[in-house]
Amino acid sequence: AIVLYLNQYPYQPRERDYAYAGSFYAFAIWIGFGVLYLWDLLQKKMDSRNAAIIVTAVCLFAVPVNMAAQNWDDHDRDGRYATIAHAKNYLSSCAPNAILFTYGDNDTFPLWYAQEVEGFRRDVRIVNLSLLAGDWYIDQMKRKAYESDGVPISFTKDQYHAGVRDFVTIEERVQQPFSMKEVMEFVASDRPETKSNRYQGGAVDFIPTRNLYIPVDKEKVLVNGTVQPEDSALIVDRVEIQLKGNSLTKSQLMVLDILATNNWERPIYFGVGMGQDSYMGFDKYFQLEGAAYRVVPIKTENNAAYYDFGRINTEILYDNLMNKFVWGNIKDPKVNIDHFHDN
């Protein structure tokens, strides 16, 4: 009944046992009957008080021992450090002083642990897209942290605080592409002509075109290593994207602003485990270098295959895989590797 009522869609991010807590009552009732049966059996041979004490002691001991005996072998995590290894591999995929966009908790919290507790690659600034809609989080991103400079965001506090530009509509008033930097300045402005009055509830910030671009300084991207010299002929004049949907969230707006304001100064990466919608059209300019995609001014048309984005820099990828990545003892035969880690 619970399964039918909740009707959860397939491929949940984790086993949601807590959703079925009500069904556990049935097992608890039968366990209670079992305890009562043992007490009834013993109290025929001794007084009820002693029978109750013995049954309670036996059950309190037998249940956890039985659980351990049945589950220890496939729950043993001794010597398994695959999670922290995976987090370090994410960070190792990034060039120095990089900005790394992540999305959920599973691809963010282990990275925070690696940086905060183990002091690993503190030059990389992790930007969690799920939190980027919060003004308090944007404040944090703009500040320097450890060895990482603040994230380049052009919006001021009064332009992104709670309740301001929580969403921005997309109105295709012009077809021609505009510089992403110019569009961000347009959205940040409080001039009356930058507001739309098409909606109930007052004026709303809007973007007047779907077609945006970031100009490319070819000399700069070659000098700072964004593009390798052997790929210089592939550099495009500008990175172009087309916005989808009818509006942008504050988080999406900040992503565009970061990419525009950065102006190819710092390396920018997106995590490999994110949904395609989070890439906002930049996936045509991705370069796989490990566990993250780097945004580069080289256009690669995506294949139809799922999660087949951009190009691969085989030299950097090979160096990361063979010389920088760690694997958390997964090759040790004594370490329990379950099917999640096999995948």
Model-derived segments and their meaning:
Residues 109-113:
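Phosphate- and divalent-cation-binding pockets in alpha/beta enzyme and binding domains
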Residues 1-21, 26-97, 114-343:
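ER/secretory pathway lumenal C-terminal domains and tails of membrane proteins involved
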